[in-house]
């Protein structure tokens, strides 16, 4: 089975993406930025995936998070990041709330001590 990729740009497309991802218990998440520091860089995009659907939200095109912001803040949904500290720094700087974060980089460090 091939993963479906959605790049929503309209409110209806963002709502559709939210409705499809909102049933997931966990989501893989990632950000793309213009630099390594949230003080000088910008948040370009946020990606979400439930394993069947990948959503790339092109913030650099002026697209807003809309209801997808609720997924990042939802304590019932585990958001899986690699090196979450980096992504969360940019998300926090943009005023985007997050909860229930799992960091694969930290997990790897703990498990391979």
Question: Which residue ranges define each predicted feature?
Answer:
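Conserved RNase H-like, two-metal-ion catalytic cores of nucleic-acid enzymes
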Residues: 1-113
């Amino acid at each position: 089975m091939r993963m479906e990729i959605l790049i929503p740009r309209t409110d209806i497309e963002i709502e559709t993406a939210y409705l499809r991802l909102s049933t997931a218990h966990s989501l893989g998440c990632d950000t793309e930025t213009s630099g390594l520091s949230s003080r000088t860089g910008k948040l370009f995009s946020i990606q979400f995936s439930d394993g069947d659907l990948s959503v790339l939200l092109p913030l650099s095109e002026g697209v807003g998070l809309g209801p997808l912001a609720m997924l990042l803040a939802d304590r019932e949904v585990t958001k899986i990041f690699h090196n979450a500290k980096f992504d969360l720094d940019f998300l926090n700087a943009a005023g985007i709330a997050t909860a229930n974060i799992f960091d694969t980089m930290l997990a790897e460090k703990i498990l391979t001590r």
